[in-house]
């Protein structure tokens, strides 16, 4: 059997070098070991999967990437697995045709669909057809509000969905009922959040009150964490870069950084229009004061969340990572807080501020009450117990056989694939015809 080169979309069975086939060493809590096989399609989902599996004791985890248009580059993969059990290990890339063989070779108790909806649907459809099938679990790689019925439909065959806050559990339980996708909604902290108890602003006293959370001095490094989808309008993105340029121009001893998720030409989970790379280049061409002092940063976010730094964003999960480390954090309020911007949860957090605050380097931190209710709940090992129960049910052949859901999933996948190969004018004409019936 041949051994795939790094990044080569081919899998040749279980006989592979240790760096490819062996699961990382297990952490033990005296529980019955379970086998989890994860399939990801993008950098953000790979990061979530490897961090999640690295936090679970008594788990034999194996991680694969599936070949697809948003497959991460070697640099993106290295950044995604940094600090996890998969750091410095090869992540095999498989094709869709390899899925059944991969699952058969490793006989997992649980298949983790850590990927975008259409890929999860393919993975779960393949796994569900096995005799004594594995349990099927999915989730999102960051903040999951608002809950999407479309996302639930792609995951129709799942047995459980992992949510990351009490509000998310409630929202996805409701979405499950409305979409008629029966599944358990499990609660877990986002795996990159590792603070003991509630995070506290670094260098602040335990008695500090919310007004004291705002930094008095400008940060040494002001990091902006962008998102592919929001804000959508170029004018709004230009306003963000303008505020960063004003900060850089007014604070010569500080640094402003746009922490990019990918380099030009690389793919992300979501397509980005009006990239900050292009906008910053335009600002520099027009000689906007301070634009030349804005840096573009690449690599793991953790490299940027250091003492003396502060983070600003519109709604990125990076805000939670920053808060977790006690770093001053600001959610930009100029564009509002709503479902479209994916940032409703931060309204009233105590960590919101304007672009004028960004330019001034006046960055705050969330209220303790908000932290306790949103994403920073206590960790009690319940997720591992829930997964252990699912694994036991899978081993005993007690998982449901959802024949009707299987049919719906196949039909959805056929429609999705036809949509990708059918010319847009034909699809548009077909939709107009349907509306006239």
What is each residue range found by the language model?
Residues 2-107, 434-437:
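N-terminal pre-catalytic "stem/leader" segment of glycosyltransferase-like enzymes
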Residues 48, 193-279:
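Conserved catalytic-core segment of nucleotide-activated headgroup transferases in glycan assembly
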Residues 61-70, 162-165, 257-261:
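Short internal beta-strands
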Residues 75-154:
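Extended catalytic core of nucleotide-activated donor transferases of GT-like folds
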Residues 130-195:
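Active-site-proximal region of nucleotide-activated glycan assembly enzymes
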Residues 271-324:
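Donor nucleotide-activated moiety binding/catalytic core segment of transferases
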Residues 310, 326-333:
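Structural loop-to-beta junction motif characteristic of Rossmann-like glycosyltransferase folds
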Residues 343, 356-437:
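C-terminal amphipathic helix plus adjacent low-complexity
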């Amino acid at each position: 059997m041949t051994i795939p080169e790094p990044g080569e979309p081919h899998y040749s069975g279980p006989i592979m070098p240790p760096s490819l086939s062996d699961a990382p060493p297990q952490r033990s809590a005296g529980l019955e070991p379970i086998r989890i096989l994860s399939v990801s399609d993008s950098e953000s989902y790979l990061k979530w999967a490897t961090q999640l599996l690295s936090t679970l004791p008594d788990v034999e985890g194996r991680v694969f990437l599936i070949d697809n248009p948003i497959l991460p580059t070697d640099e993106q993969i290295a950044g995604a697995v940094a600090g996890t059990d998969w750091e410095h290990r090869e992540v095999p890339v498989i094709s869709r045709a390899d899925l059944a063989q991969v699952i058969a070779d490793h006989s997992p108790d649980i298949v983790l669909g850590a990927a975008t909806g259409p890929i999860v649907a393919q993975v779960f459809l393949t796994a569900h057809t096995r005799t004594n099938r594995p349990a099927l679990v999915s989730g999102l790689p960051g903040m999951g509000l608002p809950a999407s019925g479309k996302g639930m439909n792609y995951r129709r065959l799942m047995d459980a969905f992992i949510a990351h806050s009490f509000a998310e559990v409630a929202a996805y339980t409701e979405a499950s009922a409305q979409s008629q996708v029966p599944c358990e909604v499990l609660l877990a902290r986002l795996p990159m959040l590792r603070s003991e108890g509630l995070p506290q602003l670094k260098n602040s006293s335990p008695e500090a009150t919310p007004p004291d959370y705002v930094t008095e001095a400008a940060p040494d490094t002001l990091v902006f964490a962008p998102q592919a989808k929001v804000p959508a309008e170029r004018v709004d993105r230009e306003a963000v870069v303008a505020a960063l340029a004003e900060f850089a121009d007014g604070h010569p001893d500080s640094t402003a950084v746009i922490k990019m998720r990918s380099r030009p030409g690389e793919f992300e989970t979501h397509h980005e229009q009006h990239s900050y790379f292009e906008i910053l280049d335009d600002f520099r061409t027009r000689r906007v004061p301070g634009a030349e002092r804005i840096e573009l940063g690449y690599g793991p976010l953790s490299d940027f969340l250091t003492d003396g730094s502060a983070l600003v964003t519109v709604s990125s999960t990076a805000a939670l990572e920053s808060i977790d480390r006690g770093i001053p954090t600001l959610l930009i309020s100029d564009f509002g807080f709503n479902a479209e911007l994916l940032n409703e949860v931060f309204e009233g957090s105590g960590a919101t501020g304007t672009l004028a605050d960004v330019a001034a380097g006046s960055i705050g931190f969330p209220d303790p009450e908000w932290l306790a209710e949103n994403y920073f709940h206590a960790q009690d090992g319940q997720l591992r117990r829930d997964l252990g129960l699912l694994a036991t049910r899978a081993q005993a052949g007690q998982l449901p056989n959802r024949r009707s859901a299987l049919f719906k999933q196949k039909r959805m996948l056929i429609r999705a694939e036809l949509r990708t190969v059918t010319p847009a004018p034909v699809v548009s004409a077909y939709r107009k015809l349907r509306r006239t019936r």
